[in-house]
Amino acid sequence: HVSIEQGKLYAQDILDYEIDEDLINSFKENDIVGGSSIFNYGEPFGRISPSTLRYVQNALDISYFFGEGDLNKIVEIGGGYGGLCKTINCLCDFGEYHIYDMEAASKLQEKYLSYFEIDGKVIHHSEPEKLQDIDLLISNYAYSELGEKLQDLYYNNIIKNSKKVYMILNKGQVSREVLLKRAEEHFDVTVEKVLDFWPPNGYL
């Protein structure tokens, strides 16, 4: 859950990007389904949920860091209710979007995303089965909340097979440093942005 105040931080960050009214309206479609708590964040957003603002900020960061052209095969570890998939699709026409999550969460994501016309195929996985040739790997908090054995499985089966990685951790600097040290074996690592919203958590 994202608080009203956290939503204000995301809204402020989003203003660094150039977005028009049509794009904002397409982002706000997220709130049509599921009875989201929406609040007035003023211009240019109007009434929008804090959770959608977080997804918008994530999607715009991904677009800024990695571009929108070469993201045909996207993987998300821990897909929430499917909101980030929907939001990214406002910016990027992907071919495949794989979501790894628990079975109950996968059913929720399928139901939510069925209300929208998503460009590309959304594929759900309830086990960390191996996947190759991933253009972009995303994890907002979920990876850092896994136990060590599951982290190993996800890293070896999925993360290291990814060309680009966008990951936010919520277990503080130790978790972040452990992951970065490991990633240096398989990636040319550059930390593009460090957001410390709620010390000592919330590192990107």
Residue ranges: model-predicted function:
Residues 1-69:
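Conserved Class I S-adenosyl-L-methionine-dependent methyltransferase catalytic core
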Residues 70-80:
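Conserved class I S-adenosyl-L-methionine
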Residues 81-92:
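Conserved SAM-binding loop of SAM-dependent methyltransferases across substrates and taxa
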Residues 90-97, 162:
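Conserved S-adenosyl-L-methionine
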Residues 111-131:
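S-adenosyl-L-methionine
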Residues 137-149:
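A short SAM/SAH-binding and catalytic strip from SAM-dependent methyltransferases
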Residues 146-158:
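A short, conserved alpha-helix within the catalytic core of class I
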Residues 162-173:
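Conserved beta-strand signature within the Rossmann-like core of class I S-adenosyl-L-methionine
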